[in-house]
Amino acid sequence: MKREKIALAYSGGLDTSVMIKWLKDKYDADIIAVTGNLGQEKEIENLEQKAFDTGASGFSFLDLRKEFVENYIWPALKAGALYEEVYPLATALGRPLLAKALVDVALSEDCTMIAHGCTGKGNDQVRFEVTFASLAPHLKVLAPLREWEFNSREAEMAYAEKHGIPVSATKKSPYSIDENIWGISIECGVLEDPMVAPPEDAYQITTSPEKAPDNAAVIDIEFEQGVPVALDGRKMEGLDLIVELNKHGAAHGVGRLDMIENRVVGIKSREIYEAPAATILHFAHRELERLTLEKTVFQYKNTISQDYANLIYNGTWFSPMREALDGFVDATQKHVTGLVRVKLFKGSVTLLGRTSPWSLYNEELATYTEADTFNHKAAEGFIHLYGLGLKTYSEVQANNRK
């Protein structure tokens, strides 16, 4: 009888290394380990050999960076998606792509089951499993961390030693860290107390603002229809542009975020994020929208931005709602083209200037100099009509009080 196959989202860490052996024994199945590169800086070399040494029957490494930027990050940037107005959704954006890649491998390898290493307390289990349900509802989903017998890292280490599973014996960081090109999330340890300032060792890439250079960096960012395309006059691919902005921002202490956020599972959590490029680009993009979007579109888009952010955070990327919102967002971005000049200095991003061929700012109408072309006499009639409803309301109230 043909053995069943399980596609496992594999990072090479302790949890997923132990999972290969555990799943293989529990389900008498072959394990296909799947790793996706979203631009994380942590060690991803030698994962194939490690997976095979741990007992995997197959291994798939997928470079997803370009797809991540073009099909996930840019749509979220155009939408202005910041969860609860702060978090640029780095981890949340990466999950549907990783889940999709896992499904693709599972289908190509004729797997009957699919497994992930998410805990039963976090958001990621929702994001992975909702994506699985959307793309391959026939696959059985396995979540070992919700059901296996290990209740501590030490128990997992003992299991690994017993079965000859190669895992790192170094001291575990007190923090839980997830990283991709759009940002880094940091939690646990002393960070669980919301009154404790994050220690410097919690931050992975950004310089402390106090230790950042005393000279500011000035950067010109060009956009075409809401998408960043150039830095300082140099046309760049999206991936390269984000990498360069991350370096500039991190060096100047930009992109440190500290928030209490509402998780999908109903609890509040304290999260620390580092997102230099995301912070800079969201800021610059919004300022260009202020210049180019008509008033009612600009104001209504705030609602759409929050809806889009919630959709990403809650794990429903592959949904009719996201496709519908993309239609609205794309329509708003047709004229979000131009240049934004920003200054990076000791943790802050400051606007220095912006210009666009689609600018709705008319200096002759806005000026208070002799060049003013605004018809001041028209204001009297406008104010009369604009306030007519309130005037009528007040008159009726006054008459009825007599």
From Swiss-Prot:
A GO term from the CC aspect: cytoplasm
Cross-referenced CDD domains: ASS
Binding-site residues for L-citrulline, renumbered to this chain: 87, 123, 127, 176, 185, 261, 273
Domain of life according to the entry: Bacteria
Compartment(s) where it occurs, according to its Swiss-Prot or TrEMBL record: Cytoplasm
UniProt key word Amino-acid biosynthesis: yes
EC number from the UniProt entry: 6.3.4.5
Pfam families (UniProt xref): Arginosuc_syn_C, Arginosuc_synth
Species in which this protein is naturally found: Chlorobium phaeobacteroides (strain BS1)
Subunit structure: Homotetramer.
Annotated metabolic or biological route of this protein: Amino-acid biosynthesis; L-arginine biosynthesis; L-arginine from L-ornithine and carbamoyl phosphate: step 2/3
Protein name per its UniProtKB record: Argininosuccinate synthase
InterPro entries: Arginosuc_syn_C, Arginosuc_syn_N, Arginosuc_synth, Arginosuc_synth_CS, Arginosuc_synth_type_1_subfam, AS_cat/multimer_dom_body, Rossmann-like_a/b/a_fold
Chain residues that bind ATP: 9-17, 117
Residues engaged in binding L-aspartate: 119, 123-124
One annotated GO biological process: argininosuccinate metabolic process
Similarity comment text for this entry: Belongs to the argininosuccinate synthase family. Type 1 subfamily.
Keywords of this entry: Amino-acid biosynthesis, Arginine biosynthesis, ATP-binding, Cytoplasm, Ligase, Nucleotide-binding
Catalysed reactions, as listed in the record: L-citrulline + L-aspartate + ATP = 2-(N(omega)-L-arginino)succinate + AMP + diphosphate + H(+)
PANTHER family to which the protein is assigned, alphabetical: ARGININOSUCCINATE SYNTHASE
MF term (GO), any: argininosuccinate synthase activity
